[in-house]
């Protein structure tokens, strides 16, 4: 499994071995739960800053691509920070990251209720299949009885003897 924060800054090379950039963002299809490709910073006088999953030749510590093109669709940065709202209208977190599998399917969103909350209680994991994307928010339809968490590191916990 990958998190977007682990994919950012991966170096991208063309098939001749020339470095063409680094991953800055991902292009997503929210309703199909897919990563469509990766976004790089735009170069001077060039609008090409995207490569699709199909254009990837090698994916590992670096990425080698066949070609780059222009992308105008939804990016993760467009929804990062959106409020996640439950069916009662209560804000239950803000989107911070995505969890993606090795086939580039988006499995879940990672959200947090705030800076201090994430250090004390951890982050929440929201399944994408239980959500609806709005213009400024995400409606989460999941059950409140089931909570998935990413627990904080043992900063304040006692060490086992």
Q: Where is each model-derived feature located?
A:
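Peripheral interaction segments used for macromolecular assembly
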Residues: 1-161
């Amino acid at each position: 499994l990958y998190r977007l924060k682990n994919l950012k800054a991966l170096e991208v090379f063309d098939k001749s071995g020339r470095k063409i950039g680094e991953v800055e963002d991902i292009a997503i299809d929210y309703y199909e739960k897919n990563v469509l490709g990766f976004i790089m910073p735009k170069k001077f006088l060039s609008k090409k800053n995207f490569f699709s999953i199909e254009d990837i030749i090698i994916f590992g510590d670096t990425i080698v691509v066949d070609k780059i093109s222009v992308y105008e669709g939804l990016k993760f940065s467009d929804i990062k920070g959106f409020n996640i709202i439950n069916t009662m209208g209560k804000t239950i977190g803000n989107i911070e990251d995505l969890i993606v599998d090795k086939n580039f399917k988006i499995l879940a969103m990672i959200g947090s209720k705030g800076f201090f909350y994430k250090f004390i209680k951890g982050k929440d994991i929201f399944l994408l299949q239980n959500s609806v994307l709005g213009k400024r928010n995400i409606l989460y339809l999941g059950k409140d009885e089931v909570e998935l968490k990413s627990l904080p590191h043992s900063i304040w916990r006692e060490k086992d003897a």
